Amino acid sequence: MKVAVLPGDGIGPEVTEAALKVLRALDEAEGLGLAYEVFPFGGAAIDAFGEPFPEPTRKGVEEAEAVLLGSVGGPKWDGLPRKIRPETGLLSLRKSQDLFANLRPAKVFPGLERLSPLKEEIARGVDVLIVRELTGGIYFGEPRGMSEAEAWNTERYSKPEVERVARVAFEAARKRRKHVVSVDKANVLEVGEFWRKTVEEVGRGYPDVALEHQYVDAMAMHLVRSPARFDVVVTGNIFGDILSDLASVLPGSLGLLPSASLGRGTPVFEPVHGSAPDIAGKGIANPTAAILSAAMMLEHAFGLVELARKVEDAVAKALLETPPPDLGGSAGTEAFTATVLRHLA
C-alpha cells in the first residue's frame, strides 16, 4: 500500500506528520505494509521547482495508491501569476487523476455540540456525508460566455457522469447507515429530471440502501433544521459546492473536517482547512482533520473500514480529553496526537 505524501505549506507539514504518526502506529500493530514517499507540492514546490505540481511529484502520485495532502498556499505566493499559484496545483492534481467525486463528512462529535452554531439538541448526532460531483455541471458546461449585453453558462450532465458519482454515494452508504438523499431541482430543470431518473436507476442495484429525493432549496432548509436525520447526500457540482460549505459549519470548526476526492486515478485525502500561515510552526495546529483524512484513506483507498472507525473513535475520545486551542482547550499538535495514539493502543 503505497502512499504519496504531499505536506504542502503552512501548517500542512505539522498536521500531516500527526496523521502519519497515527498511520505508523496502526501499521506497527496490524502489519498493514504501508509505504510512504514525501513530495513537494504547492508553495513548497514553487520554491524548489518553480511550479506547484512538478514532474517528480506528478510521477509519485501516478505510482501511488493514495495521496495524503496537507494544505497549500500562503501570502508568500499570493503575488504570483494565477497559473503558477499553489492553489492551481490542487486543480492540476485533481484533473490529472480524473477525480470526479468529492466526499465531505460533517460530524458533530459527542460532547462538542456546544461548538455548533445550532442549538445543541439539533446538533446532537449529526453525521452527514456530502458526495459532490466534481468535474461536470455548470462549472464546466459549454457553451459559456459573456458579452456587453448578456452572459450565459450551460448546466449539462451525461448519464455516465451521474451514474459514477451515484455509485460512490451508494457504496459509501452501505458502510454507514444505508440511506442516500439525492438532491436536484427536478421541478424546474431538465438536468434535474435527468439526474433524478439516473440516480433511481443506479439505486435499483442497491436494494439494501434507501433512496430519497430532495429539491436543493428544501435540502438547505433541512440541513439547518434537522441535520441529524441525514446519512449520505449526493448532488451535482454547483449544489454540492453550496451544500458542502453549509454542512461544514455544523461541527463548529474547520479543524474537524476531512475530505476525499475519488475517481479513476489515485484518490486524494486532505483536510478542508487552509494552510493557516499565522500559526504555522507554533505547534498549536489542530491535526484532527488531517488524522480523519488518513482514516478516510484507510476506508476508501484500502477498504480498511474497521480500522478507519477505530481512528475516528480515538479522535472522538481525544477531543473530549485534550481539546486543541481552536476548540477551547490547550493541547498542542503533539499532545493531541499523543492522546489519539494512546486511545488507539
UniProtKB/Swiss-Prot annotation:
Positions contributing to substrate binding: R94, R104, R132, D217
Give the organism, scientific name: Thermus thermophilus (strain ATCC 27634 / DSM 579 / HB8)
List residues binding Mg(2+).
D217, D241, D245
Q: Which catalytic reaction applies to this protein?
A: (2R,3S)-3-isopropylmalate + NAD(+) = 4-methyl-2-oxopentanoate + CO2 + NADH
Any GO MF annotation of the entry:
3-isopropylmalate dehydrogenase activity
List the protein's name: 3-isopropylmalate dehydrogenase
Q: Which Pfam families match?
A: Iso_dh (PF00180)
Q: What class of enzyme is it?
A: oxidoreductase
InterPro entries attached here? Answer: IsoCit/isopropylmalate_DH_CS, IsoPropMal-DH-like_dom, Isopropylmalate_DH
Its needed co-factors are:
Mg(2+); Mn(2+)
Tell where it localizes: Cytoplasm
Q: Which PROSITE patterns match?
A: IDH_IMDH (PS00470)
Subunit structure and binding partners? Homodimer.
Tell me what happens on changing Y139F: Large decrease in activity and a small decrease in substrate affinity
What cystine linkages occur within this chain? none
The answer to keyword Chaperone applying to this record is no
Name the job this protein performs. Catalyzes the oxidation of 3-carboxy-2-hydroxy-4-methylpentanoate (3-isopropylmalate) to 3-carboxy-4-methyl-2-oxopentanoate. The product decarboxylates to 4-methyl-2 oxopentanoate.
Biological process terms in GO annotation: L-leucine biosynthetic process
Q: Mind naming one GO cellular-component term on file for this protein?
A: cytosol
Which pathway does the database say it acts in?
Amino-acid biosynthesis; L-leucine biosynthesis; L-leucine from 3-methyl-2-oxobutanoate: step 3/4
- Family named by the database record: Belongs to the isocitrate and isopropylmalate dehydrogenases family. LeuB type 1 subfamily.
Q: How is the cofactor bound?
A: Binds 1 Mg(2+) or Mn(2+) ion per subunit.
Would I find rRNA processing among this entry's keywords? no
Report the EC number(s), separated by commas if there are several. Answer: 1.1.1.85
Give the record's keywords alphabetically. Amino-acid biosynthesis, Branched-chain amino acid biosynthesis, Cytoplasm, Leucine biosynthesis, Magnesium, Manganese, Metal-binding, NAD, Oxidoreductase
- Residue(s) at site: Important for catalysis: Y139, K185
